[in-house]
């Protein structure tokens, strides 16, 4: 197979995503004609990479923020070019004002035209701050979490000021439990858990089916290459999928605060204690810059040496 041109950017990104070696990453990209996702699977089939990292690639600065008001809450992300701006009080105040309006606005288009205390729209206020701060600022996304009865838990990781930081999480618990203090404490703990464990879905039914099929295919082909018989492989795949669920499905994950129990078991215990049904209806996790791509300016000499040959 003739080698295609593989850029240093892609090799570096694949290494960061999989933990595989530089040469292995380059070979995987060549073998898959530069297809990034296929290269990940190629490495995993060869046993050269760990499971795909659950967190998205962080590629932007700024702040995420949450606001909880009774049974309704909002989370937003506002991006800046540098972390220095994220520590700027004027920028922090801007983000606070925007998240306070987000609950009322309900969607990002309405939020952008919502009026701030200055009388200007959010969009206009952002433009004014760009001129003052000297960096490009973007209201990237927002989401709403609302429940009819129960508790909303919120958590912000790496807070720079209260409710603003690098990772923001909201968790909604629907319940008729009378002890709201204990219910709110549970919601808070689950929010912290979500921040640290980054689940992809609440339960197995809501998990993207393509992720499950991809995991099955990768593990099946890896086991087949190792020469294992099909009837053994099938049982191993079943076990691997159970493990996969324990890694990415919230209810199947071991609870951060009680590792011997799953989140589902913790909720069941809480239901018995509070004499009421408890259901996680939704969770939202915003990690700053998640999924945003940007060009790298400098690379290690080893990257250049490997990819320019």
UniProtKB/Swiss-Prot annotation:
Keywords of the record: Cytoplasm, Elongation factor, Protein biosynthesis
Single GO term (MF): translation elongation factor activity
Keyword Ribonucleoprotein annotated: no
Cited function: Associates with the EF-Tu.GDP complex and induces the exchange of GDP to GTP. It remains bound to the aminoacyl-tRNA.EF-Tu.GTP complex up to the GTP hydrolysis stage on the ribosome.
Pfam families referenced in this protein's UniProt entry, alphabetically: EF_TS
Stored SUPFAM superfamilies: Elongation factor Ts (EF-Ts), dimerisation domain (SSF54713), UBA-like (SSF46934)
Identification of the protein by name: Elongation factor Ts
NCBIfam families: tsf (TIGR00116)
Ranges for region Involved in Mg(2+) ion dislocation from EF-Tu: 82-85
Classification via PROSITE patterns: EF_TS_1, EF_TS_2
Cellular compartments annotated: Cytoplasm
Primary location class: cytoplasm
Organism: Rickettsia prowazekii (strain Madrid E)
Family in the record: Belongs to the EF-Ts family.
Keyword Transcription regulation tagged: no
Gene: tsf
GO CC terms in record: cytoplasm
């Amino acid at each position: 197979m003739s080698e295609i041109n593989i850029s240093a950017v892609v090799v570096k990104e694949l290494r960061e995503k999989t933990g595989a070696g530089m040469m292995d990453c380059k070979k995987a990209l060549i073998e898959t004609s530069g297809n990034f996702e296929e290269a990940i699977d190629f490495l995993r089939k060869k046993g050269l990479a760990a499971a795909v990292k659950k967190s998205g690639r962080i590629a932007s600065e700024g702040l995420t923020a949450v606001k909880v008001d009774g049974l309704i809450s909002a989370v937003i992300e506002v991006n800046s070019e540098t972390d220095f701006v994220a520590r700027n009080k004027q920028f922090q105040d801007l983000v606070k004002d925007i998240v306070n309006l987000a609950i009322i606005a309900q969607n990002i288009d309405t939020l952008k035209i919502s009026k701030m205390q200055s009388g200007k729209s959010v969009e206009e206020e952002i433009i004014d701050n760009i001129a003052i701060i000297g960096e490009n600022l973007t209201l990237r996304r927002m989401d709403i979490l609302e429940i009819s009865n129960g508790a909303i838990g919120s958590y912000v990781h790496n807070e720079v000021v209260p409710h603003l930081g690098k990772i923001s999480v909201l968790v909604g618990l629907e319940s008729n439990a009378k002890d709201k203090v204990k219910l709110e404490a549970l919601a808070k703990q689950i929010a912290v858990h979500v921040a640290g464990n980054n689940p992809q879905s609440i339960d197995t039914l809501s998990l993207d089916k393509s992720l499950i099929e991809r995991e099955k295919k990768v593990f099946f082909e890896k086991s087949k290459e190792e020469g294992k018989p099909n009837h053994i492989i099938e049982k191993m795949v079943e076990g691997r999928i159970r493990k996969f669920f324990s890694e990415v499905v919230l209810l199947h994950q071991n609870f951060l605060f009680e590792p011997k129990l799953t989140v589902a078991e913790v909720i069941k215990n809480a239901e018995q204690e509070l004499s009421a049904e408890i259901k996680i209806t939704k969770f939202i996790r915003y990690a700053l810059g998640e999924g945003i791509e940007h060009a790298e300016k400098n690379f290690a000499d080893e990257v250049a040496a490997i990819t320019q040959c």
